[in-house]
């Protein structure tokens, strides 16, 4: 029997994802028409031996309740949300809920960070872990990055037999181009390691050496568990070449959307809208909107036959798209309205937002450099060294109104704004 743990953090995390995370928890933001962590759940349920999925975080239970209920109805696996009483780090939550994780005596458990998107090769990772025998405490999924980008991730050095001989989280200087993907298979014996760290923190606290102001149970998996395990012969790394990316900024959601839509061709072709088929239940059966693959259209969306969508577009529930609209490389969220002959490129249109006729909403993609092998998504800060806004995708927050014949370029609009003019390279507060 196996279990899986999905780590989702809490409300004070994911601030770079704002304004999209202001009204929707980041783990539940829809990418390719499904919440981010539903893609994790779907990867887990493909493993027959897996009987339970535990979602760990400190979002209020009320925000996760509906999602967990939906997943229970969709999949034949027990799914629960365990709420931490405070931020406990990437390993502290697992140690706090160790009894729930160990119940049923699972042989091992997966750990997936909730802020990554990937073509998760979980069966391959589990087989790799089993092949290393009982000595293996942790097996890490790794991928190649460029030399310059690797220092922004956890870096590991592999010795013979794929053993991790050295591990450093976000090193100051170059260590290795093989980075940690935030996807693990762990043996139950790992909890004894966590217990050792916890008890040493208790001793520090009792001797008044605890000066970080964090809870005693706050344990970082990467720094406090993985780094000491390196070189002990109990931690192994599996390099994979499949697609992987972090979801840190809103721009990475567009990038993730593109790749998940491409994966649907093999995993869920029914989720893709195909040219030549009826685009929505509200459209005339004999007329179809123009679709350039890959596109996901929710069944309740209304798309005019003269609209052109794609490539890499996701249309959410209740969306209304008018005549002559052109949308490319974008995510249109629930109940948004896009009126006649409007152009939307490299943008995310928030829930219940409205864009008038003949408007142009355009952003700048922040894709990996195609000329560099193994390049990952750049997650630049909002502002450059001159204090100017870095060009990025355009984001409309919840219930934003853009009037007709306006241009919105490389801008971020916070919720509930009614724009009265065009904007370029601005944050509209």
Predicted regions and their residues:
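Conserved N-terminal catalytic core of the sugar/cofactor nucleotidyltransferase
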Residues: 1-25, 29-124, 390, 398-399, ...
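Long, charged amphipathic helices and adjacent flexible linkers at domain junctions
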Residues: 261-299
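Glycine-rich hexapeptide-repeat left-handed beta-helix
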Residues: 9, 323-429
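C-terminal accessory/binding modules appended to enzymatic or scaffolding proteins
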Residues: 294-320, 324
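Charged, glycine/proline-rich intrinsically disordered loops and linkers
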Residues: 200-216, 281, 367-381
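Catalytic-core segments of class I nucleotidyltransferases/pyrophosphorylases
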Residues: 106-110, 117, 122-133, 145-150, ...
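Short, hinge-like loop/turn segments at secondary-structure boundaries
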Residues: 70-73, 100, 128, 155-161
